[in-house]
Each structure stands twice: as C-alpha cells, then as structure tokens.
Amino acid sequence: MKYEIDKKRLVIRVVPEREEDLYFIYLLIDKGDIIRGWTVREYKPDGVKEGERIKMYLAIKAEALEYHKFRGSLRVRGPVIEVQEGVEGVKGRRHTFDISIGREIEIEKNEDKPLEVVDEILNMAKNVMPRILLISIDDEEAAFAYITSIGVNVLHVVRNDAERSRGDSLLHDYLVTIGKIAEDLKRRLNPDKVVVTGPHIVVEQIGNYVRGDRVAQSVGGLAGIYEFMRAGLYDGLKTEMGIKAYERLMQLLATERNLVAIGLEEVEMAVAAGRVEILLIVDSYIKEDPHRAWDLIYKVYATRGKIYIIREDLEIGTSLKAMGGVASILRW
C-alpha cells in the first residue's frame, strides 16, 4: 500500500495495491471521518431532463462501512459535504464511495489522535505475508484454501469419487482434475506462493500436475488445511496473524496467570501501568467501541508494546471475542 500522512491536517492519503490493503483501510476509518476522492455518480443539472453518470471529486462524512473480506470490496456511505466547483445539487445528498485497488482516497480523521500508530497499522499492510494458495490433498479428498495475513478462505473441496475398479487411472484422473482447478485459481488469485500438503506419497504424485512447495503431513483434504495452520509449518505466517502471540497468551494463562490480562477492565489497568508487552484485540471490537479500542492501541504503542489486530472469523478471534475482545501479555 502507498500512503502519506499529514499530521498537521490529520489527513491520510492511501492507494490500496492489493485486496488485503482494503482491510487495513477499513480498520482506520471511523464514523465521522471525512473521505475524499474521485468517484462516479449520477448528475442532473437544472433544466436537463435526464441525468448522466459522471466522474467528480467529492467528500463524504462517513456514517457506515461495508467490508467483504475475500470479495475485495470496501464501501463507505454518508452525506456529501464537499463537491468540486461547477457541480450543483449534489452537496447534502447521500453517496457511497467504492474504495478500490489503485484509486487514491484521502481520510481526514475527526479527532485529534496521534497518527504515529496509524503509520504503524499501515505498515502492517506493507509487511503482509505472501498470499498462499494451499492445496491440501490425500487419495480421497482435496481442499483448496487462500491464505493471507487477514485470514484463511476455503475455496473448494473436491472428492475423489471415481470407481475403485479403475485401478491406476483412478488417481491419474483425480490429480488431473486437481491440476486444472489449481491452474484456474492461480490465474484468478495470482498468489505469491503455491503450497501442496498432505500425506507424503500423494504430495509427491501431485508434483507432476501442480507446481509448488511440497509439505508432507499426516492428513490432506479439509482436515489438512487446519493441520497445516496448527502445525507451524509456516511460522512466519503464524507470527504475522498473531497466532503465536495467542498461543503464548494461553500458555501463560495456564501457568502464570499474573502475566496476562483478560477483558477490557484488566487490560485497561495494565495499560495504565505501562505493563503491556503484547496487545491482542479483535477487529470487531474496534468497530463496536472505537473510542476505547483506539485509546488502548495508542497507549500500548506509546509504551513500545506490540499490537496484533485479530480477525474475529479466525479460530483465535472467536476465542478472544469470548474473552471480551481484548487480552494482553504483560511485562511483569
């Protein structure tokens, strides 16, 4: 993601470069922020019978956000408060900004907040892990998943339903099908890396049909996707997604309860004392109570703590949500 921050004007200019960037922009936009940029909307000047859709530069005051994780869609709705010169009758009406890849927008924050932490969060987008197309396969089932720093999306599950009596052609036809699906997904998703995982024998055989890194594990199919994520075979991915920090939190919760804070009240007390080493916060909580959530994030950043924003739809996000949406590992 390309971005610039004007700390005096509280303005952030961003250009999303990949779908994951839209998620981080979604996190940064709060209700009341002003969003500026080029957009297309219907315009009907006075005296004209029929309007037409034209490109114009305008600003809205954000009232609602709609983000779809793997659809690559981020929309911001609100009333128009500024419009380019020469365009009449648009100001005051409602408009929806479709924030898309490659298009610059400007976000003006509605409160005087320290923008250093905004810079830190935007850096998360710049340092995202490679996008992985994971093919988890055994002789009965193949599952395809798209893994990015913002989550795991299971795309397809294919059963090997060929007749067992067909012998050697059974596996060949199955692997040909898997290879065709893999090529289609590679063209559509343009992943940075393809990883094939499953029992060693099948992984070696699929290598003739799909090019990619091979990782042997005990099971394939849908169960193999979850084993891959749990096993730490790509430790860097687990670190970026906050999984390792969560695992450490749970270990300390069982062995040294005094070194963790669970829930908003405990975490706020720990933050006030400067004790927080790592903060884990669920993304949905940031939208539910943005004032308190950002206050925590800013204070942890100011005391050089590490911040992980966890997606609620991840397994660890569901667990953190049950803890109150926020937890932390303490320095002492």
From Swiss-Prot:
One of its GO terms (biological process) is nonfunctional rRNA decay. GO terms for cellular component: cytoplasm. The keyword Iron does not apply. The keyword Metal-binding applies. Its cofactor is a divalent metal cation. It holds the Pfam family eRF1_1. It is found in: Cytoplasm. Its EC number is 3.1.-.-. It comes from the Archaea. GO terms for molecular function: endonuclease activity; metal ion binding. Keywords: Cytoplasm, Endonuclease, Hydrolase, Metal-binding, Nuclease. May function in recognizing stalled ribosomes, interact with stem-loop structures in stalled mRNA molecules, and effect endonucleolytic cleavage of the mRNA. May play a role in the release non-functional ribosomes and degradation of damaged mRNAs. Has endoribonuclease activity. The N-terminal domain has the RNA-binding Sm fold. It harbors the endoribonuclease activity. Monomer. Belongs to the eukaryotic release factor 1 family. Pelota subfamily. This is Protein pelota homolog. The lineage of its organism: Archaea, Thermoproteota, Thermoprotei, Thermoproteales, Thermoproteaceae. The gene is pelA.
